[in-house]
């Protein structure tokens, strides 16, 4: 199909040697993998141990990026919890713990593994809106924490992805391109559907099949040398 890169899928082999062989047959390299952090609900040492194990795997695969998402109190995987109006809001102490932890993880990733930590904002998590992304970006070190820019998740929660990419293009080190069907998002709101139910109903789609205008977004990324 012409693909040269892939993120690590849920069903991919966990042994790097096995995965390498499967990918080499297809001319594909690994670029990134999701990491679930629980910085405000688990001891940092526990999160760090899991993080290091995943970094070692990604380094063996030759990847340069890890995409972290804070999953403490996340409702994204709860089938019966409406995605709108039910997400957890961090207090000031939790924000401090979260941002301090992200800085520590990012420093480990960069200095010990040569991998960039990119933070993945996500529907149903503690960092979903632009205001929450702003607070995280303001309180983390650009040297160690970058943004995983996801067009779909920003649009889903009512933000303008073009505004975001203009604001943070120089801290974006990974991009997810999703499109949104606004009529399905409206259905999700009206029927108090969960995130997973919304996915199944078709809230997300491929670029060009939804409401996002990608041309200006691509121009900002290209002009910045992404």
Model-predicted segments: where are they?
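A short helix->loop->beta-strand "cap" motif at the edges of active sites that frequently abuts
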Residues: 28, 63-64, 115, 224-226
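Active-site acidic/histidine proton-transfer and metal-coordination neighborhood
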Residues: 44-147
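N-terminal pre-domain/capping segments
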Residues: 1-65, 92-104, 142, 146, ...
